[in-house]
């Protein structure tokens, strides 16, 4: 392997933690870990550390949690670490040019898409939602723009018709660390050079929010089926039946027509609902206060509740 580097790691969620875990198994020295401040989580809204912070503390690594890296004090603290390289994975803070210039080899980022497609916050879910045939991880040299830097390395994986946001996330979380380690070796040896992104091909992966997870039955069934997969396990698509919320965690394309949102049929195979085009069969649901269940299990005990002719989402 090439020379061991002094590395600062910056990341926050589980996807980033997988990268840190892999780097800890290399000869490189992690001199500090940057992550988002602890956030309230769960029913009790108790302050919880990020996945990256938890892993860093397990390994006795120094943890930094600045609110911003735009001020001179935070930048001086980073410079004092004398890092050769900063590895950034889903950190959640914008890095100004002054920060990008601090490490000797700059900053690299592992981004969960095949750039320049799906720059931005939610590339995994947007790829599934759009019906893309493939996704992957791009390791890039960072610059001040959002995911615009020269591409150092790409690895790809097909997106199957069964993939969810969760399953694709897990696959990319396994691919990304290997790509980062390979890119670090190339940078250290001076053999890896970036490919400029074609901005004309860029698309933007807007951040997910709970409001957009409400199913719009006027849309084509093929789009809603992809949305259900993309938004599982979060934020989870939802609708309502007789004013009660209904979470939808599994669906498949069905046949039938009717006014959008109308229940066409309920059976052990699922709840068939008319859409703007075609029909969607809901196969996995979660009722208020309950756990996610296959519709077959709900049908056994609640078939009257799902009688045909009712309209969802009213």
From Swiss-Prot:
Binding, (6S)-5,6,7,8-tetrahydrofolate: 113-116
InterPro entries according to UniProt: Fmt, Formyl_trans_C, Formyl_trans_C_sf, Formyl_transf_N, Formyl_transf_N_sf, Formyl_transferase-like_C_sf, GART_AS, Met-tRNA-FMT_C
Catalysed reaction equations from the record: L-methionyl-tRNA(fMet) + (6R)-10-formyltetrahydrofolate = N-formyl-L-methionyl-tRNA(fMet) + (6S)-5,6,7,8-tetrahydrofolate + H(+)
Keyword Membrane part of the UniProt annotation: no
Entry-linked NCBIfam families: fmt
HAMAP family to which the protein is assigned, alphabetical: Formyl_trans
Protein's job: Attaches a formyl group to the free amino group of methionyl-tRNA(fMet). The formyl group appears to play a dual role in the initiator identity of N-formylmethionyl-tRNA by promoting its recognition by IF2 and preventing the misappropriation of this tRNA by the elongation apparatus.
Name under which the protein is recorded: Methionyl-tRNA formyltransferase
Organism listed in the record: Pseudomonas aeruginosa (strain ATCC 15692 / DSM 22644 / CIP 104116 / JCM 14847 / LMG 12228 / 1C / PRS 101 / PAO1)
Top-level taxonomy: Bacteria, Pseudomonadati, Pseudomonadota, Gammaproteobacteria, Pseudomonadales
Gene behind this protein: fmt
